Amino acid sequence: MSVRRRISEADGAAAFAQVRQVFDTVLSGEKPLISAENRTEIEQVFARLPRGVRATAVRYALDELATLAPGNSVEVRVPPYGVTQCIAGPRHTRGTPPSVVETSGFIWCALAAGALVWDDASASGLLTASGERSNLSRYFPLF
């Protein structure tokens, strides 16, 4: 079963290119990844992007994950921008799904761009992941 994308490839790629530029501009030199020391600065630059660009980039990355890992056993929440389900396994029909991942739009885009590593984000509390299938580290970076 194919996943129906909510964001067109052209719109999503254009929005994500703007997000990637934030990471590429700030993350140069010897520290290629987001760290506790530079996260606030990068997040402020990300927040200055138009809301529509941020929303489109997040939704595009959610669509990409759902395409790479189709299924319904993990729900990925990135409030207020979007949600998707992915990973094959037990399907839920009501209530909380068996596995849930939740994070901010900034962290989601950083993971998708490869500017942040899943294990670092999880260990530092920048995302929450519960359930046996909630470790999505093998899918990142998405782009």
Indicate where each model-derived feature is located.
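Feature captures hydrophobic
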Residues: M1-F143
